[in-house]
Amino acid sequence: MNPKISVIVPTYNAESYLMNAVNSVINQSFGFENIELILIDDNSNDGIMDILNDLSRKYENIKTIFLEENSGSPSKPRNIGMDNASCEYVMFLDNDDEYVEDFCKKMYDTIENHQCDIVTCRNYDVVKGEYQKYHSVLDKRPDFVKLNSIEEDPDLLSTTSMLIWNKIYKKSFLLEIGAKFPSGTLYEDVYFNLIAFMNASPIVYLNDYFGYIYNIRVDGDDKSTSQDFKEENLIKFYNGLNNIFNLLESENKHYSNFESEMLVGFTKWLVLTKSDDKLKLRFFKDFKKHYKRFSLFTRLEHIPLVFNIFINLGIKLMSLSDFTFKLVLKIAGLIFN
């Protein structure tokens, strides 16, 4: 057996849905014998250990790794997965998502044929069983885009381009640039991809291909992190965004649309998270210079234009002073909470 792609899957309390993810890899048209599947468990307390042990006994190309302490985010498991990957190429999968049947073949053929550092594609958002094609700046680009540098089209650094699991990476490239996921934060995938995209050459975008199924859990105690608006996650998002802004400053880079999109996402968390207003104000002050240069013309392709304008005006008003920040936050909270 000589696998060509290492697929890295961090797991945590995923007993009820992990096998959907695993089976989507096993059933790839690429041939499972061409895949090394690495499952890293972040000290789960459900019955997932038995599932992982059964898988590693059944398949010689499945590696299982168990962390003795919970790390609190997918970062450490993913980093360990990369350290243990033996293949030329690396892909990622979240434990509650799935690959489309030809995903690995499509990505492998593209990265081989075009000798890229990164290939990225589109994904389906699935909410309560309904498949949705997420709209983004990519809708306005050709079906196939090849860049020698992201500087050729920096607007492609949209938040949808920064997802970790709709891509294939050349492992030697990741090792060369020292790309790692930061611990203890969210936006960890954005930070990782920002380093990768600023250094990659070439990069290919498959804008007409939807290869990844992103299952968004919106109900109950088992919500997706992106839907779980609690103070602990707000703090992690703040830390993650701070890392991203610091990285851009250290590299003397400024990507207006990307930074504005990130601020919109963070502002959503400020509005929807039930937390101490003093904490929110402190976070706002820390990012005030970024709010000041927020582009009023930021276009969020996945929402209607009128709502987009409303959001942009709100953020510009917030940036004027502490008073307007509190006022807009209060009004938005009444509307959306």
List each model region and its residues:
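Membrane-interface aromatic/basic loop that binds lipid-linked glycans or pyrophosphate carriers
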Residues: 275-337
